[in-house]
Each structure stands twice: as structure tokens, then as C-alpha cells.
Amino acid sequence: MCIRDSINSNKEVVDYLSSASKNLDFDLIELISSGPEEKLNLTEFAQPAILATSIAIAKIKNINSEISVTAGLSLGEYSALVFANCLEFSDALKLVNVRGQLMQSAVPEGTAGMLVVLNMELADVYKMIEKVNSSEEEINFSTDNAEGVSVLAGKNSSIDACKKYIADNDFRRVKTQMVQMSVPSHCSLLSEAQKELENLLNTVEFKVPEIPIIPNVLAKPTSDVDEIKNSLITQLTNTVRWRETLKYLSENKIHHIIDAGPGKTILNMARKLKELEKSSLLEL
């Protein structure tokens, strides 16, 4: 049974999602169930849909209270905060909906993007960024996902400059692919959106989490509310340190990792660390 069917067949979850999303100006259940795909591709709708799906999966699978730490990649950090009872689900939905709108309006459509760079050493990634930024271009290290998996963000000309650098320097094993997102994330292009998001976050109540969370920009656990809130603001324009987050989990002998998000991306990245290969990696 696909996740859409699982959600629709569970009245408790449907009621929970409906209640939490009543302040949104669109039908969240209908969006998750029926799309359309064109609407789901817009980040202002994709973000609440992904958040809701992640929380729905956690509720359907009835994840117990034995979780010792929680973390979420990029948008997933909001799901982690909801799961840790640091942030009300309804507040999180409103936040990510507005976050998506701010991001969508910050960058003119088709002018910028995100580039996945595979099989390039981290030192070479930084060298490329330095070289590209020494010209009139600006490329940002959007997401440090895992060993050999880096994501860059910037204007189209900066993306092209990175591709040219790779070709000119004969990185034969290195492959690139564009991320299918309507706007780039975790980059300086979102500076204005960041200011608006900060204003909005200051109107929302955050509670001390019942489970420590590893924010994207810290890569280590915290239960400090101010630190958590500031991390949500900072991550919009700064690098997501996911590789370091996974490294923390492996070094601190986290033996079971449960992924409540859509797809297998998180677990596939976790498997790149030898220590985590031995962990129980469970996709819900």
C-alpha cells in the first residue's frame, strides 16, 4: 500500500492532518492524495506536503518513545521538531508553507538552481567553490550530504561555471545532475527570505524538546530552544551539515536509525558510512 493510501485509510491520521492544517489556504489532504503534480513541484506546496507525510508515517507506524535523538535533513528539521514535541504540528505546517512562499518569491523562476556533485573529494569541492567565487560568480555549498555527495546552489551562470571547472580539470569519476526543485536552498540568494522567516519564527512558541535534536547547521545535539530557533533561521542560507550529522551518529554508537520521510535518500546516505552499515536502518 502506498503512503497516500495508508494516510487516506487511517481516519485518526486524516483527522489529525485536517485539524492541524485548518489555517492553510489550501486542502492539505487533497494535495497529498491527488496533487496535481505541477502544484506539488512548487516549494510552497511541496514543503507542507512533505512535512505532513513524514509526520503521518510516524503516527501510522506508531514509533515508540525509545528514540534517543532526532534529526531532519533541510525541511526535515521541522518534522524532527514536531516529533520531539518542540513545535506544534499546526505551527510547523504554517511555518513551512510561508517558508516555501518566501523562497519561491526570493528567486525568479528559472534563474538559479542546485547541482548535485558526485564522487568529488570534499577538499576538491571547496577548491572548486573558491575558484568559481574568485570570479564574478557566487556558488554556495548548499548541502554536505555524505562522502562523495555534495550539493551546490547558485545562479545558472554559477552552476555552469562549476560544470566547466569539472570538465576543464578532468575529474573523470565526477558526475553531476541538477536537483528537481523550483528554487535553490541553503544559499545567499535567500537572504531576504531569511529575514522574513526570522520575523515569523519569533511569533511561534517553541518548547524544550522531549528528545534532543541535531540541527543542520550545528551537527550536534541540543535541547536549547534559542539555539534550535536560530538554527532554523541560519539553515536557510547556510550549509546543511548532514555528513557530519551522520558521523556524529556513528561515533556515538547509534545502532538503529528510523527514517520516516518519503523515499530512501536518507538511508542510502547513511549506508555510505561503514560504521552505520552495521546499524539497523529502517525505512517506514
Where are these regions (language model features)?
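FabD-like malonyl-/acyl-CoA
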Residues: 4-127, 256-284
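Short glycine-rich catalytic loops that host catalytic nucleophiles or stabilize transition states
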Residues: 178-181, 250, 283
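Alpha/beta catalytic cores of group-transfer enzymes, especially the acyltransferase/condensing modules
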Residues: 22-26, 85-237
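A short, acidic, amphipathic alpha-helical segment used as a generic capping/interface helix at domain edges
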Residues: 237-254
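NAD(P)-dependent dehydrogenase/reductase Rossmann-like domain
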Residues: 158, 200, 239, 253, ...
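A structural motif
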Residues: 67, 171-173, 254
